[in-house]
Amino acid sequence: MRGYDLINAVLPDELILEIFHKLDGLKSSCDACSLVCKRWLMIERLSRRTVRIGASGNPDAFVKLLVQRFVNVRNVYIDERLPVSSPFQFGYSIVPGPTHTIKKRRRTKNARPSLEAPHTSEDSRFEERELEPFSLSDAGLFTLAEGFANLEKLSLVWCSNVTSMGLKSIAEKCGSLKTLDLQGCYVGDQGLAAVGECCKQLEDLNLRFCEGLTDTGLVELSRGCGKSLKALGIAACAKITDISLEAVGSHCTLLQTLSLDSEFIKNKGVLSVARGCSSLKVLKLQCINVTDEALLAVGTFCTSLELLALYSFQRFTDRSLCAIGNVCKKLKSLTLSDCYFLSDKSLEAIATGCSELAQLEVNGCHNIGTSGLEAIGKSCPGLSELALLYCQRIGNSALFEVGRGCKLLQALNLVDCSNIGDDAVCSIAQGCQNLKKLHIRRCYEIGDKGIITVGENCKFLTDLSLRFCDRVGDAALIAIGQGCSLRYLNVSGCHQIGDAGLIAIARGCPELVYLDVSVLQNLGDMALWELGEGCPLLKDIVLSHCRQITDVGLAYLVKKCTKLESCHMVYCPFITSAGVATVVSSCVNIKKVLVEKWKVSQRTRRRAGSILSYLCMDL
């Protein structure tokens, strides 16, 4: 009977609660359920396990409201880079507006921009904190600790007003805490020591840009909860040295993941971790003062290593990678970025010893050439992802071997590889027909021939990016449209592509959700008309620097693509204020429009000011 609830009254709360637990976890799904009726609203509040909020617009009051309404929360994520999205008001209006991505850090006059911080007490910053009323404070953390005593995950990203006092309240009240992210927080040693003393189940700790910490805090934490710690990240903490890592090596014997980015860490610290943490599986290092000696120890003791990432090392040689290849037989992922002294011998050693390798990235290692990658192609049949960035010495024959030997390859990324051309891409397309993702940028020897072969052979391709590839034209996109069902396409700067290529994509890729056609001088309204007809799921489009597109084509596109969420259209001379108004008024889901400020009418600005972004011209 219409208007009469036949089933809701007989469903017990426990059953509805169980149904809510089966949802996808998205906030939109939870909110939709809570709007059914008051009973479902109350039950949904009981079922909510995760909240994500920004830390601007009086976050302390916002946290207090959350604690009152969602009593069973286990995971809290607070990020000061994000604005609070709340319909509630706390004695004043919350108006959307521009927010600073990262707040200005407190520094001494001579401090280095990212690695050093002033040595000031937390009390001396009280007056300064009063000038920032829209940041999460210790009072907010105290409320959080009192309300969410069963908290398991807490992320505080760039909450610069939080101090040791607030962190101590969390530690004392939330003994079940397992994950703690303090990125960009100016907490001190006392707070970290309290976490070590009280949170004996802590497994994951992130200390990126925690400039107020010293060895004292991390040593105390390691002694307190080192037995449970499995993941540790340290970056730009100028006062954390080898002393801390020695404590980690001594007390954190179950550590599996370690990420270090510091010029103050030397061999001694990494050696201690390698010897003490034999269960290490993930190691990421950006430490310019670490040498072969440290990696030789990793190769000796860390036999379970699965992921190794080395960034900007000037002191590593082939000896290090040979040691890794000889011992770390389980290695599945390897990233080498700006390691200038590594040569083909390193990749040959990895290929010989690490046959399970699935992911390889070589970025700016100028002494690594063709023979090293050939060895990978011959010996690592399980390779699924390959990225070659700024590898001028790697030629076609290397990808010939990858095409022959790595049939499971699903993702290939090529950036500024001047010696790789169409023949190499053809070999990959014919040999790796499971390819799903292909990104190519500024590889000027790659043109229509290679991309046509991809369209003919790689039927599972969904993500294609061809940025500033001068030799790629309409014929390539016609083949892609006929052979692949893309979801993501970026052809920015491919000036030979025009309407014909995009029309083929529109007719052959109905599931397209992202499109970047910026800097295509030959693209006109006909392509936009076809995109509107053929790609109804399109959410994001970049049209900047397309000088033939007009308001007419734009109007037809937005009329048909009702799911559009973002549109970039700067430097399009034939798009006027009328076109901008059409986008804003026609797309109910639009979240961002990037355009020149002078093209926005007063009416459009009043109607949709919060979603408009302007090109910065006044430099």
Q: How should each PLM-predicted stretch be described?
A:
Residues 1-184, 188-222, 226-234, 238-241, ...:
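N-terminal adaptor-interaction module of cullin-RING ubiquitin ligase components
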Residues 85-87, 94-130, 216, 224-225, ...:
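C-terminal capping region of solenoid repeat domains
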